[in-house]
Amino acid sequence: MEHTPHIAMVPTPGMGHLIPLVEFAKRLVLRHNFGVTFIIPTDGPLPKAQKSFLDALPAGVNYVLLPPVSFDDLPADVRIETRICLTITRSLPFVRDAVKTLLATTKLAALVVDLFGTDAFDVAIEFKVSPYIFYPTTAMCLSLFFHLPKLDQMVSCEYRDVPEPLQIPGCIPIHGKDFLDPAQDRKNDAYKCLLHQAKRYRLAEGIMVNTFNDLEPGPLKALQEEDQGKPPVYPIGPLIRADSSSKVDDCECLKWLDDQPRGSVLFISFGSGGAVSHNQFIELALGLEMSEQRFLWVVRSPNDKIANATYFSIQNQNDALAYLPEGFLERTKGRCLLVPSWAPQTEILSHGSTGGFLTHCGWNSILESVVNGVPLIAWPLYAEQKMNAVMLTEGLKVALRPKAGENGLIGRVEIANAVKGLMEGEEGKKFRSTMKDLKDAASRALSDDGSSTKALAELACKWENKISST
């Protein structure tokens, strides 16, 4: 049996959950000499991008794929959060076997799950392994998770129907309509899953959150206040992925950026899981054209049914460029580059020519922007992204959020004005300055004596003591 402390990590489905958890694992291995094994539940073959990502894990980080669970009994319209929770629940016998093997072969100090994975705590408790949560998004959203059981009892109607903003401890007031998606329909199984998970958060011995003190001082202060039964919270971020694949080196888009003036390009991407409707796709294209700004757009095929259309499968089969308005490519020639499906986001955001980012407000994307000091246009699509947009626009004041019309679409003029405002306007200058301050704060948090580095060291010390006392 090896003598280094070992951590088991159980991610829920989705690259957005896996990427920061892997970055966390790398820090434990490289800085604190831990071993990590990912226990990965599945519901079928892994998407190619996820398989490549896992196969590139460094020494000291291993993974085991669990047998696929079946969802044949679920209706076609089951919500994504329900499916994520059930992936864990239905995999528990396999998680148990994997943990049993690790206990026999390693010094297992903790079982770490992510935000919807607390049903795996049953296995940790059975084997007397410390249960922890890695929370991949904001401290604001984590504060809502802790507050939700109380809110559930206090509010009788749908949260979106409460006329005044709701107060989450430590956070700016937020309207119920901007709560995370599964809280929008309290009769749906997805809300029941959310509430079930939230109630189990107090079973954790600690929660690591992918944020840092200067980014979210209010929510973190509220979370770290003494409260009977609330676990300690460790802000260890920003944990972001460094693009290091070979296809980055000769990427056409980086060569194109090299030829553009400094800070002149708006980057547009809706993340690995996001899609907009066909009509919205057209308005976005025409708005970008009207703005007369340079832009680099990761184009994915529109989807009229769901905003998280590519969440479980990053490959996008259709030719997205075929959906563009007629003549669009000719009219924007020379000032735009369209990239189908994938682009090296971290490299693009760190490039000197990139001056703004139109984002779906996924937390990984926001953190990458913060680390590179790039101001934003907030275009939330699903999950907790509306909450993130409120935080960016009203809390941090680093983003514009174009408004949708009565038909639910954000119109081309509104889009053009937002793009011009960010890239050329006074507001854009203010956002850029604030983002520069946050970039410096992020760098300080990750420095040798920074707050996030210290929080990780405190956690590692706790886990080391755990195995030395057993």
UniProtKB/Swiss-Prot annotation:
Q: Which residues form a coiled coil?
A: none
Annotated an anthocyanidin binding sites:
17, 383
InterPro entries for this protein: UDP_glucos_trans, UDP_glycos_trans_CS
SUPFAM superfamilies to which the protein is assigned, alphabetical? UDP-Glycosyltransferase/glycogen phosphorylase
Q: Offer one Pfam family short name for this entry.
A: UDPGT
Give the binding site residues for UDP-alpha-D-glucose.
343, 345, 360, 363-365, 368, 384-385
UniProt EC number: 2.4.1.218
The alphabetized UniProt keywords are: Glycosyltransferase, Transferase
> Known CDD domains for this protein?
GT1_Gtf-like
This entry's Gene Ontology molecular function terms read:
hydroquinone glucosyltransferase activity
Catalyses: hydroquinone + UDP-alpha-D-glucose = hydroquinone O-beta-D-glucopyranoside + UDP + H(+)
User: Which PANTHER family does this chain map to?
Assistant: GLYCOSYLTRANSFERASE, UDP-GLYCOSYLTRANSFERASE 72E1
Per the entry, what this protein does is:
Broad spectrum multifunctional glucosyltransferase. In addition to hydroquinone it accepts at least 45 natural and synthetic phenols as well as two cinnamyl alcohols as substrates. Hydroquinone was however the best substrate. In contrast to this broad acceptor substrate specificity, only pyrimidine nucleotide activated glucose is tolerated as a donor substrate.
Describe the family membership recorded for this protein in Swiss-Prot or TrEMBL. Answer: Belongs to the UDP-glycosyltransferase family.
Q: What is this protein called?
A: Hydroquinone glucosyltransferase
